[in-house]
Amino acid sequence: MDGNHSGGLGLVGDIGGTNARFALVEFDGQDPRLIEPTAYRGEDYGTAEDAIEEYLRKVGVKHPDQAVVAVAGPIDHGQVHMTNLDWRISEDGLRRAGGFRNAKLINDFTAQALAAPRVGPKDLRQIGELPTSGEGDLAILGPGTGFGVAGLVRRHGQEIPLATEGGHVAFAPVDDVEIEVLRALTRRLDGGRVSVERILSGPGMEDLHVDLAAAEGRGVEALTAKQITERAVEGCADSLATVNRFCAILGSTAGDIALTLGARGGVFIAGGIAPRIIDILEKSPFRERFDSKGRLSGFTRSIPTHVILHPHTALIGAAVALTPEGRAAVS
């Protein structure tokens, strides 16, 4: 791809703990357009390079000029060992596998942050009474296989993403039920530390389902996160209680992150779980818990919250990172 992207194709990727998604990207002016976005199960491939080679064969493109791949995990000197998938990925390895002139790894929620201001109203669901704001810094967070967190600093017309590992901060219970959940998770981890990701994720929802019942002195059928969310939507009492508690904890955590990042411009919830439970989330204690910050409740009450419904937000953000402005922001 040349400097203004005319006539060329790039490759973008979004590799999480469960799925690896890829697309070709071309630019219409400064706006990226995704071509043939495709998802693969990570467990079906030995390496990320294998999945990329399969995708390039599928679309019949040999050597896109540049690539940006968003990954779930901390990147160190152009390398990452995935947090929830046993893949080691390097920029050098990507360049060799795809024949790219340049290849860049970015955090998956850095990509979400770059994309958030570009998501249109039809792909957003407002949670609470406040509409989106065109000003102020943003927080982007969300549960999926893990729990991702990023910020977006907006200054003087520039947007600078802030990569974090905020999903691994300690879980802070707010009532007796959540204290019992914390105790149960601590025992399950042999006395280990309980991060918010241990609850606000697909695997975390499965543990929460069991631990909430145990807190009431009873057992419950062990279910997958997919089963819990589906049954909750259908009205199953136990599953609905789990999802409501999940949403409440998500609200508390999102409010804490908004305070930490000073996200006056809004909080965006991304990831695979929130869109599946969106109607429950709207009616849940999410916003009440988000606002409930003691002496700083006035601060959080002024912050809008939205769920991102677009299925390829991280790919859009990776495409933004191919632009000159995006490259500068993630360099």
Curated annotation (Swiss-Prot):
Instruction: List the GO cellular component terms.
Output: cytosol
Where on this chain does ATP bind? G13, D14, I15, G16, G17, T18
Tell me, what's a Pfam family for it? Glucokinase
Q: What class of enzyme is it?
A: transferase
Ranges that cross the membrane: none
Localisation: Cytoplasm
The lineage's top-level taxon is: Bacteria
Keywords (A to Z) from UniProt: ATP-binding, Cytoplasm, Glycolysis, Kinase, Nucleotide-binding, Transferase
What is the protein name stated in its UniProt record? Answer: Glucokinase
Q: Which gene encodes it?
A: glk
